[in-house]
C-alpha cells in the first residue's frame, strides 16, 4: 500500500537499497547522532513481526525519512520516527506524521501513540498530539498520542 502527500510517498522497503536506506537513517539519526555507536541492530526480530510495518518516506529517488508503524487493534504505535539530516527543517516531519496517520486510518486505527524524544515534544504538540500524562513531559521519552477522526 502506498500513501502520497504532495510529492512525497510512504512506502514499505522492498529492495536491498530500500532496506539499507531505512536502517542507515535510523542508525545515524536516532542512535549515532545521540552518541550511541554500535548499539543499533538492523536484525531485530520485531522489525518484521506481524502487525509491524517499516516505512520509508520517499520523494522521487530520495530517501527522506523512516517510521515503523505497529498496529495493534485500533491503536498504532509510531516507532523510530526520523527525517534524514539533509531534509530536516523542511516540513517533512509533518508530512511523515500525516502519511503515517493516513496509513493507520487505512488499517482501522483510531488512536496513534509514540514515545518521542523530549526535544521533539513541541513539534508533536504542533501536529496535534497530546501528552499521555502531565508527568510524562519530564520523561526521557514522553508518551504522546493523537485520536484520529473516523
Regions found by a protein language model. Give the residues of each.
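Conserved N-terminal entry element of GNAT/NAT acetyltransferase domains
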Residues: 1-17, 150
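Active-site rim helix/loop that mediates acceptor-substrate recognition in acyltransferases
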Residues: 24-60
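Conserved beta-strand in the GNAT
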Residues: 56, 62-70, 77-82
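A conserved beta-turn-beta hairpin within the catalytic core of GNAT-like acetyltransferases
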Residues: 71-81, 88, 138-141
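Conserved GNAT acetyl-CoA-binding A-motif
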Residues: 97, 104-117
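A general lysine-centric signal
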Residues: 146-147
Amino acid at each position: 500500500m502506498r500513501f502520497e502527500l504532495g510529492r512525497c510517498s510512504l512506502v514499505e522497503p522492498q529492495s536491498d537499497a530500500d532496506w539499507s536506506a531505512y536502517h542507515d537513517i535510523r542508525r545515524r539519526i536516532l542512535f549515532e547522532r545521540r552518541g550511541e555507536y554500535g548499539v543499533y541492530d538492523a536484525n531485530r526480530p520485531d522489525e518484521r513481526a506481524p502487525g509491524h510495518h517499516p516505512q520509508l518516506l520517499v520523494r522521487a529517488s530520495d530517501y527522506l525519512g523512516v517510521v515503523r508503524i505497529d498496529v495493534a487493534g485500533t491503536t498504532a504505535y509510531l516507532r523510530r520516527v526520523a527525517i534524514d539530516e539533509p531534509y530536516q527543517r523542511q516540513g517533512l516531519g509533518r508530512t511523515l506524521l500525516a502519511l503515517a496517520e493516513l496509513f493507520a486510518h487505512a488499517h482501522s486505527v483510531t488512536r496513534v501513540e509514540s514515545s518521542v524524544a523530549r526535544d521533539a515534544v513541541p513539534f508533536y504538540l504542533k501536529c496535534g498530539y497530546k501528552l499521555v500524562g502531565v508527568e510524562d513531559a519530564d520523561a526521557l521519552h514522553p508518551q504522546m498520542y493523537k485520536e484520529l477522526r473516523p
